[in-house]
């Protein structure tokens, strides 16, 4: 096997303008789904029952075609097909790393962006669990200097449907719904769910898309549907302080902070949002996070940059900064990407840093880099069309239009 397996699994399907305009039932709350059915003439006395049926088929059985809903009357299925969709996003490309990590490049409709947009989702299999890294925006506004995604301009927010669709598609591809099988040779947990954990650590800043992220995660953790434990869902933010308390209060998932520096002058460079919400405000918001305890610690992400933030003085500053916060500190060896000016800290220095933090009583695992060969690792996500120079991208888009609806 080569270092990177890149598999183009689909071409743009032929859509009519009418089909593109159909609203999706994915991402709607029960109340919104009921209102949508009511608007299409479903009798009031049937609404609750029909919503329960649809919820089960979409989120428990994982169907993406109304015709597969065998206990729904045929005339109801025809109405649903005519007015709604539950289709998955288009897979532009699926890449499989030599460590089993999978990265999907997904395409969604323009929705005001002027052209179809692309995002990436990453699946990381480990012993005992499988983690899906989900994107919340197309691009990012934060321009963190060490992050590849930060070099891509923000195009638009993802909808709740588009956020949830990443999870549904991953479970499809991994055989994680009833009566489904995974592709032969797929690396994943031997027992239990194939997707057991979600991290909102993909493209974008989740708290700059709070409402859609909230709706998607509440559906993902709904006990009558996808039924993920909230303790297995982690939302990562670079420090949008006003929304941190709301995240705990209204969503109730685990929190991770992209910290990366212990001094404001350095964090202003590495994570520019620090200029708006400096470290003191960020740490105070963390201390007030609802449900915070030794059993529900905040994870602080700290990318290790050679001769930038990896000294023992930085380690001492980190301990001082986090005093009084139940915390785990994830040390992340920097993942290189083309054009970056940063280097990864020497492994010996990373271990010294970790040992110092451990001796102060903080868990400080060193995150094993995953999917580096397919640019799927932390800080490397960036949609393929945005990596290209403008002329290449235009040529690529022209090819996509030319292939629109083409047969294999």
Swiss-Prot record:
TM ranges: none
Signal sequence region: none
Known role: Specifically methylates position 2 of adenine 2503 in 23S rRNA and position 2 of adenine 37 in tRNAs. m2A2503 modification seems to play a crucial role in the proofreading step occurring at the peptidyl transferase center and thus would serve to optimize ribosomal fidelity.
Cofactor note: Binds 1 [4Fe-4S] cluster. The cluster is coordinated with 3 cysteines and an exchangeable S-adenosyl-L-methionine.
Binding site for [4Fe-4S] cluster: 140, 144, 147
EC code: 2.1.1.192
Cross-referenced InterPro entries: Aldolase_TIM, Methyltransferase_A, RlmN_N, RNA_MTrfase_RlmN, rRNA_lsu_MTrfase_RlmN/Cfr, rSAM
GO cellular component: cytoplasm
Family statement drawn from the similarity comment of this UniProt entry: Belongs to the radical SAM superfamily. RlmN family.
Cofactor field: [4Fe-4S] cluster
Catalytic activity: adenosine(2503) in 23S rRNA + 2 reduced [2Fe-2S]-[ferredoxin] + 2 S-adenosyl-L-methionine = 2-methyladenosine(2503) in 23S rRNA + 5'-deoxyadenosine + L-methionine + 2 oxidized [2Fe-2S]-[ferredoxin] + S-adenosyl-L-homocysteine; adenosine(37) in tRNA + 2 reduced [2Fe-2S]-[ferredoxin] + 2 S-adenosyl-L-methionine = 2-methyladenosine(37) in tRNA + 5'-deoxyadenosine + L-methionine + 2 oxidized [2Fe-2S]-[ferredoxin] + S-adenosyl-L-homocysteine
UniProt-recorded name of the protein: Dual-specificity RNA methyltransferase RlmN
Note: Reaction proceeds by a ping-pong mechanism involving intermediate methylation of a conserved cysteine residue.
GO MF annotations in UniProt: 4 iron, 4 sulfur cluster binding; metal ion binding; rRNA (adenine(2503)-C2-)-methyltransferase activity; rRNA binding; tRNA (adenine(37)-C2)-methyltransferase activity; tRNA binding
